Amino acid sequence: MSDSACIKNVKVTMLGGFSIAVDGHVLTDEANRSQKLWNVLSYLLVHRDRNVPQSEFIEQFWPGENSANPVNALKTMLYRVRAMLEPLFGSDVEPILSRRGSYSWNPDIVCTLDIDEFEALCHRANDGRLSDESRLALYRQAEQLYRGDFLPKLEGSLWVIPYSVEYHNLYLQMIKDYAALLEKKELFEEMTEVCTRASHLDSLDEQLYILIVRSLLRQGNDTAALAHYESATDLLYRNLGVRPSRELRELYSEIMSVEKSLETDLEAIQDDLRETAARPGAFVCEYGFFREAYRLEARRAVRSGT
């Protein structure tokens, strides 16, 4: 116990990748180890507040195998995990304990997990009793802490999936709450940056694009707002087969109403039209544009008698 107590600073990262740092020495999942080894270690750390029965490990990582081999395989795997951790903790410290057919993380070795920090920051930032400045500071910390989804290299493991979904959803909600506060404080540039980073982690969340387009409009950057609108609607249609929501279409109408720098150079317009005409495939456009184009074409047909 005294040896364990000498270890003061154990930090575990699981968002965006796995790492464990002990007093400045770091082990990451970039090391060439088996996926099952990282699974067992991560599972122990996530459930470090309890004893994990041997049967639970076998059910998670050796399902459907006969009774003898999984037990031996688990013992071998835990031996390898301990050997991997020894350079961090030393030979006198046992980070993993065995007792009565179960295994646990040594409770004397206190770990700080980024997932716990992230969750706590999100909940604190939602406290309406705090000042806007205090909440913004908490949101900024939470946003910086979320470097990616939960254990991405183990995303195919069944036990990882619910955690990954939980933290991903918590992250998205945090970003949207953060953006709402930034909009209230008229910090539109930061709002754009935050929501753009989030869109790189979830490229199919329409609400993020709504926030990006709106923040650009509030900065008077209607050209960039239109470009983001067009790329977002194209991306969502190609991947999900969905049309823009009413909220996004309303932003499009707002872009059109505030557009100041219309192209008036006839030669540039002709060049652009020639380039557009040369593109293969179907022409995807906003419904409002299609309606006006249809009406113009119908009137032309009436005039020409076709």
Model-flagged regions — what are they?
Residues 267-287, 306:
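Amphipathic HAMP/coiled-coil signal-transducing linker helices
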Residues 2-13, 78-108, 237-246:
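DNA-binding patch around the recognition helix
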Residues 33-42, 67-89:
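DNA-recognition element of transcription regulators
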Residues 29-61, 81:
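Short amphipathic alpha-helical recognition elements used for nucleic-acid or partner binding
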Residues 284-304:
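Short regulatory alpha-helical coupling segments
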Residues 67, 102-267:
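Intrinsically disordered, charged and Pro/Gly-enriched terminal/linker segments
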Residues 1-40, 94-102, 268-271:
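Short boundary/linker motifs that mark transitions into or out of structured domains
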